[in-house]
Amino acid sequence: MCHLTYGETMVTLIVLGSVMTLVFGLERIVPLGMKRMPSPRRFLATDIAWFLVAGGAGVVVTLLLAPLLERTAVGPIATLLEIAPTGVQLAIGVVLYDLASTTIHRAMHKSDVLWAVHKVHHSSRELDALATTRAHMLENLVRQVPAQTVLFVLGFSGANVALVAVLFAGWAVVGHSNLRVGARWIEMLFVTPRVHHLHHVPATSQRNFATVFTAWDRVTNRFVSVRSAPWDEFGVPGEVESYPQRFVDAVREPLKEIHGRRHARLTA
């Protein structure tokens, strides 16, 4: 198995940061964006902090957990995978990673505890590239570890799992961005910014769970393609105005909510 070194891990994070910076700039050019972005951007410091948290979570998963997860590989399947070209491995990896991530994402909307954690991601009032990494550190582990475990069990090397994660994250950045993707035929297969933005609108937050492929939502009757108007409001359903936007408050909010639910059950 091929492990990623610390240096290679940092290069991966730099590449993702560069992609996010590029998209962040392009989406603010009026002809390229779906709507004019507010200037200055609200809660910029908060989302930079969440970006750093996401980077830290990536380092932990890659350097500490990945070497352990590689040991879960099922021999016969891993042998078959090893003879496949790298491009085929990556394509299979992205499909499986997106399926696993979509399944976990739907679970986060169904479980009260996981939803309390996932609310942080839905709290973005404006969607752009930087909104991609607005996610609680607990969510980073809940979303990344199971999805990567699926690949490791099938025999993917640490390096290829990292490449799959980079491709997935890059598409997530585009999906959260304000970029205008005009060709509707693309949405027959892929999630576009227009499609994913509908998931962040409270009225349709139970739709469009996938990050890369629309097929997962189509086969479960969860896909919606109603046109997202410029005035659609993003935010946590029922808490659009009240959910904390400051970083420290948002870090504590899921823990407070989970503790409150537990206390209510014990005293009921």
Where in this protein do the model-derived segments appear?
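A transmembrane-helix-recognition feature enriched in membrane-embedded lipid enzymes
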Residues: 47, 211, 215-222, 247-262
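Structural signature of hydrophobic alpha-helical transmembrane segments
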Residues: 10-24
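A membrane-cytosol interface segment of integral membrane proteins
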Residues: 232-268
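Loop-to-helix transition at the N-terminal end of transmembrane alpha-helices
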Residues: 15, 38-52
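Membrane-water interface of transmembrane alpha-helices
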Residues: 20-32, 103-113
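Helix-coil boundary and interhelical linker segments in multi-pass alpha-helical membrane proteins
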Residues: 1-11, 67-89, 147-161
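Membrane-embedded catalytic scaffold of the fatty acid hydroxylase/desaturase
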Residues: 50-61, 84-233
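Membrane-interface helix-loop junction between the first two transmembrane segments
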Residues: 26-44
